[in-house]
Structure formats: C-alpha cells, structure tokens
Amino acid sequence: MCAAQRSAAALAAAAPRTVYAFSARPLAGGEPFNLSSLRGKVLLIENVASLUGTTVRDYTQMNDLQRRLGPRGLVVLGFPCNQFGHQENAKNEEILNCLKYVRPGGGFEPNFMLFEKCEVNGEKAHPLFAFLREVLPTPSDDATALMTDPKFITWSPVCRNDVSWNFEKFLVGPDGVPVRRYSRRFLTIDIEPDIETLLSQGASA
C-alpha cells in the first residue's frame, strides 16, 4: 500500500463509508453540489474526457441511461479529467461547446450533471475519487487494469488502485455505498443490468 493509499484508508476509516460526505463544484459554476442531496438515488460516476477515442460512445450511452432510467432514480455524474493523454485540455467554460460541436458533435448536450475538471489520481485527486478508489481498488471486469505506459503517468504517487484511463465507471447504491467499479473497456450501456438491480432494491426498501 503506497502512502496515498494509507492516508486514504485512514480517512475512510474515520468517515462514513458513503459518497454523501463529498461535494463537487458544477461545471456551470456556483456553489459546491453536495452528494448528500442524492440520498436514495443510484449513482453512476465516470471520469470523462471530450477528446478521447470513446468520447462519442460513452457520452451518448451516459445520456441514454440518464434519459431512460433517470425517472426511476438513476443519476449520472461526469467528472472531466485531463490526466489521461491530455484529452480534456479545454477550460471548464469550453467543455460544453467541445461536446456540442466536436465530440460527440451534432448539437450534443449532456442531460446529466457535469462537474468542474478535477484530478482522479495522485496527491491532488478529488476526495471523492480517492474514496471510490479505496473502497473499490480494481475494476470488477478487469482486476489487472493498470496504466502501464510511463509517458502517460503524470501524477504522483502512483498507486495500485489508480484509475487507468478515461471513462472508468463507479456504481453507487441508493444507500450511498460504492458497489462496483468497471474498466474503460466495459461499455457504459452494459452496466444497465446492475443499475436495474439496484433500482429494484431501492424501490423495495
């Protein structure tokens, strides 16, 4: 366990094991948004980038899930991050136009909440992602997923539970507890059965 992991573990042990302890500033600006306001919702959290090879696929699938399952209690949350191949190098105020006119383009507008750019690995990692990585150290579909190309590692320290690329996914249950982590190779749309299971649990609670 690296020093950052030990620190995160100590923090996690001292705090509730839910995402409700965290907040983030919306991409549109304004006051920090408290995730505690989403109690009872199923959350799908992804680190996103507007210039990635899977931007079109993942953004449109995130929109699709939010459109169809949002009325039943799903909330999709996107966190732009520039740590992987510098593929989110736009300023916060430029990201929506990049999505609208470049990728996915064609007037695309996300129907889910986007937050300001943040880091997900290293000393400056957003506390939410430090927490998610500690609770779910590896993707369930690929426990060996790692960033293996040194030229793309721009953060320090490097930890075994680091996010390895854009569009890793974290699924959180209606009680705020992280349930499952998926690699970048796992299609966003294929998380739907797991989301359905959690939505059913929430409805019967």
Swiss-Prot record:
Domain of life of the source: Eukaryota
This protein's UniProt keywords: Acetylation, Cytoplasm, Glycation, Glycoprotein, Lipid metabolism, Mitochondrion, Oxidoreductase, Peroxidase, Phosphoprotein, Selenocysteine
Glycosylation sites: 117
Site (Subject to oxidation and hydroselenide loss to dehydroalanine): 52
InterPro entries (alphabetical): Glutathione_peroxidase (IPR000889), GPX_AS (IPR029759), GPX_CS (IPR029760), Thioredoxin-like_sf (IPR036249)
Residue(s) at site: Not glycated: 41, 91, 100, 124, 151, 169
Post-translational modification: During periods of oxidative stress, Sec-52 may react with a superoxide radical, irreversibly lose hydroselenide and be converted to dehydroalanine.
Active site per database record: 52
GO cellular component: cytosol; Lewy body; mitochondrion
Subunit structure: Homotetramer. Interacts with MIEN1.
Biological role: Catalyzes the reduction of hydroperoxides in a glutathione-dependent manner thus regulating cellular redox homeostasis. Can reduce small soluble hydroperoxides such as H2O2, cumene hydroperoxide and tert-butyl hydroperoxide, as well as several fatty acid-derived hydroperoxides. In platelets catalyzes the reduction of 12-hydroperoxyeicosatetraenoic acid, the primary product of the arachidonate 12-lipoxygenase pathway.
Family: Belongs to the glutathione peroxidase family.
This protein's name: Glutathione peroxidase 1
